[in-house]
Amino acid sequence: MTPQPAKVQAISDTYELLRLAAARRQAVAAIYDGLPRLLCPHVLGRKSGQLHALFYQFGGSSRSGLPVGPEGMGDWRCLAVEKLSEVELRADAWHTEPRSRRQTCVDEIDFDVDAQPAEDPQ
């Protein structure tokens, strides 16, 4: 058996894919800290010079677990883009909840879903 190369994405490619997903209000699947996650990217930019994103995680795993609320399972997550791997667009429905407080995940905002008009589904 020939070993297969690991699926590697450049950080810039990952970031652009997340930006596209956010603009389309489309979910992504990814690996973060070795755990599979289903995420909806809401805010993208930099914190202390590093690329970060604020996601709503609605599925997959997490070391801290996912709470179950009235809308189902989910929670807000601030994740470093460089720690994401195997990021793929998904056909899952867009998931979100009102932000209970001002986000502090991203200092220099490049993209915020809440500041963009929703795309018209065709």
What do these predicted ranges mean?
Residues 2-122:
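Core beta-strand-centered patch of the WYL/Sm-like small regulatory domain
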